């Protein structure tokens, strides 16, 4: 059996340089290779013209550059594109491209499914399957960039911002998310500014501290409720890491972060008559009193079977005005891609059904195996 090749998309620059040292090559050769991969979208070693033929042959013998494939895509009337990305074994994740006048953002997944069971989120209904590898995370950016078109002559890339807000909780896959984000930030990787890479978390506090020790990126925090009683229901991880513990972790992170410019983005989904009253707005403002932040109010995006409804515009407006009375910066997020189920909280769709079928098949196979043994 031939030895499995190393997928170079799994390696950040430190790991790439270690590989090249093992090949008897100087570190700058690793940097050259990364530039070909991430600046120009090249996956064929023979196209890497400033790398000598002998090294190209060594690389081809031991390594490969393989990104997950696009299974299908849907384009919204507002230009948003939702991609189903095949990650092997019948599994898919969703990645969303959001074009705007001054930027082009890619919403990237970190897991197949999610284990946190937030009750307003479609992805939670899928359940958790597995963590994505580094190559499957950065490969979403690489593959969508190919779809949109790398400018191979200039190295200009079509994606300016990345948000880790797709399927999964990034902090539960820290071992792969950190090197993946390192590649996003690296000058020889996707070369994105740390203010243009955002990680969103529901509050896995110990992992948030580890992230702060490893990387500096923009942070968005999923609060969604002004007190522990309601948040225990909406975001069950709150039972393990309640609000005050989460907020303390947030303050520790932004204290050592330059990317956040001294404040964090609070995400708050607006659920009709659940968390959107005037009293709850006052409660949220007081909760965030000691945590510098701007608040992003997210109109809920319904999905089939959801127990919640979207807050009316008038309730969102009242809620927003109360927060602003406390001096908070408030943004009401414009819903993008909801006609193709690509909006916040809607990711899963047909993928949920396919994943459940796969899990059922695996369970049946395991039962057969146990019976035979």
Curated annotation (Swiss-Prot):
Binding, S-adenosyl-L-methionine: 168-169, 200, 222-224, 301
UniProt: [4Fe-4S] cluster binding residues: 114, 118, 121
Residues at the catalytic site: 94 (proton acceptor), 344 (s-methylcysteine intermediate)
Main localization, broad class: cytoplasm
Listed GO CC annotations: cytoplasm
Cofactor requirement: [4Fe-4S] cluster
CDD domains in the cross-refs: Radical_SAM
Entry note: cofactor: Binds 1 [4Fe-4S] cluster. The cluster is coordinated with 3 cysteines and an exchangeable S-adenosyl-L-methionine.
Compartment(s): Cytoplasm
Keywords, ordered alphabetically: 4Fe-4S, Cytoplasm, Disulfide bond, Iron, Iron-sulfur, Metal-binding, Methyltransferase, rRNA processing, S-adenosyl-L-methionine, Transferase, tRNA processing
Family (UniProt): Belongs to the radical SAM superfamily. RlmN family.
Note: Reaction proceeds by a ping-pong mechanism involving intermediate methylation of a conserved cysteine residue.
Name of the protein in question: Dual-specificity RNA methyltransferase RlmN
Gene giving rise to this polypeptide: rlmN
């Amino acid at each position: 059996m031939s030895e499995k090749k190393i997928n170079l998309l799994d390696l950040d620059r430190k790991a790439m340089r270690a590989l090249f040292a093992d090949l008897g090559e100087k570190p700058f050769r690793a940097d050259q290779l990364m530039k070909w991969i991430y600046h120009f979208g090249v996956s064929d070693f023979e196209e890497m013209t400033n790398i000598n033929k002998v090294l190209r042959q060594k690389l081809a013998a031991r390594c490969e550059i393989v990104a997950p494939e696009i299974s299908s895509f849907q384009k919204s009337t507002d230009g948003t594109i939702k991609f189903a990305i095949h990650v092997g074994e019948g599994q898919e994740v969703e990645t969303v491209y959001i074009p705007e006048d001054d930027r082009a953002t890619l919403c990237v997944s970190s897991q197949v499914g999610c284990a946190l069971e937030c009750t307003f989120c479609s992805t939670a209904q899928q359940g958790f399957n597995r963590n994505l590898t580094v190559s499957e995370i950065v490969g979403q950016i690489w593959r969508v960039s190919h779809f949109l078109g790398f400018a191979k002559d200039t190295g200009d890339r079509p994606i300016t911002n990345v948000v880790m807000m797709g399927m999964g909780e990034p902090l539960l896959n820290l071992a792969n998310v950190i090197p993946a984000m390192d590649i996003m930030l690296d000058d020889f990787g996707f070369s994105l500014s740390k203010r243009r890479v955002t990680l969103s978390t529901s509050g896995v506090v110990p992992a948030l501290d580890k992230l702060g020790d490893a990387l500096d990126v923009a942070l968005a925090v999923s609060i969604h409720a002004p007190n522990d009683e309601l948040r225990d229901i909406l975001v069950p991880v709150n039972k393990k890491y309640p609000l005050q513990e989460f907020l303390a972790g947030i303050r520790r992170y932004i204290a050592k972060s330059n990317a956040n410019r001294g404040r964090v983005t609070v995400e708050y989904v607006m659920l009709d008559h659940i968390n959107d009253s005037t009293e709850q707005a006052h409660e949220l403002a007081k909760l965030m009193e000691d945590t510098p932040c701007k608040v992003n109010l997210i109109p809920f995006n319904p999905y089939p079977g959801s127990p919640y409804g979207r807050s009316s515009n008038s309730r969102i407006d009242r809620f927003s005005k109360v927060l602003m009375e406390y001096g908070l910066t408030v943004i009401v997020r414009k819903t993008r891609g909801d006609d193709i189920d690509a909006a916040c909280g809607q990711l899963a769709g047909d993928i949920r059904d396919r994943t459940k079928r796969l899990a059922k098949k695996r369970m049946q196979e395991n039962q057969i195996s146990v019976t035979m043994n």
